[in-house]
Amino acid sequence: MAQHDQLHRYLFEQFAVRGELVTVSETWKQILENHNYPQPVKRVLGELLVATSLLTATLKFAGDITVQLQGDGPMNMAVINGNNQQQMRGVARVQGEVPEGADLKTLVGNGFLVITITPDEGERYQGVVGLEGDTLAECLEDYFLRSEQLPTRLFIRTGEVEGQLAAGGMLLQVLPAQNAQGNDFEHLATLTETIKTEELFTLPANEVLWRLYHEEEVTLYDPQDVEFKCTCSRERCAGALRTLPDEEIDSIMAEDGEIDMNCDYCGSHYVFNAMDIAEIRNNASPADPQVH
């Protein structure tokens, strides 16, 4: 098995085209933990994970990207959030029976692809495109064409290696403010499209690039680790409780004696008792530990 859960950037200087290659296994597995998703939903989350990793690698600033599918199908929501440090988390919501072998359109139904870019400093940007493509890669290419106006191709694969979940993908994109020739970009895209799933999952990045582009000059940069990391915390939950009306909190406390909050992403469980609520109302941060 190749070195998994790593992202590699590479560059074709003579063509003004950049590329990325990512493979993930453990990160995908951790996203699926604590959830009993049908197989097609697991696959889509793997594809979203790959896509989000590739997209966050295009950021030139500290921040995060959220890639979300929304629709009226049996999987009415699936989302992956990742930052420029390649820290990922994700979740899906299933509201109906998922047919075995369901494709993207069957899962999501009539829906949208929503991409939200949130810099640590600066304005948040959100782009929305209809799910007109048959695959997630096609929908993302449509997004780039409409919003960024940068020729972009994505190649996303999911499967198993030695009994372990594996997902991977590649991205090609014309560098901003560069005038790459269309024929050159299509030539590189045609080469990239020949990647075999087994090669992507099992070969080191430098060997994958050599097999695809051995007649081209390619600069491969140092890899970046991809990992699962949830940003939930007791403090964030307390902040959410501060936004609720006192009457609503009092009603829950009167009925249950405490407030339970669960993180959909990682399964962490937070409990707030009457003393905690009093501290929250006094703008103090409750110090009780989280309960897993």
Curated annotation (Swiss-Prot):
Gene Ontology CC annotations of this record: cytoplasm
UniProt keyword annotation of Zinc present: yes
GO molecular function annotations of the record: protein folding chaperone; unfolded protein binding
Highest taxon above the source species: Bacteria
Keyword Thylakoid tagged: no
InterPro entries in UniProt: Heat_shock_Hsp33, Heat_shock_Hsp33_C, Heat_shock_Hsp33_N, Hsp33_helix_hairpin_bin_dom_sf
GO BP term (any one): protein refolding
Keywords in alphabetical order: Chaperone, Cytoplasm, Disulfide bond, Redox-active center, Zinc
PTM note: Under oxidizing conditions two disulfide bonds are formed involving the reactive cysteines. Under reducing conditions zinc is bound to the reactive cysteines and the protein is inactive.
Name of a matching Pfam family: HSP33
Subcellular location: Cytoplasm
Disulfide bridge positions per record: C230-C232, C263-C266
Family: Belongs to the HSP33 family.
NCBIfam families the UniProt entry points to: PRK00114.1 (NF001033)
Main function: Redox regulated molecular chaperone. Protects both thermally unfolding and oxidatively damaged proteins from irreversible aggregation. Plays an important role in the bacterial defense system toward oxidative stress.
Protein name: 33 kDa chaperonin
Organism: Enterobacter sp. (strain 638)
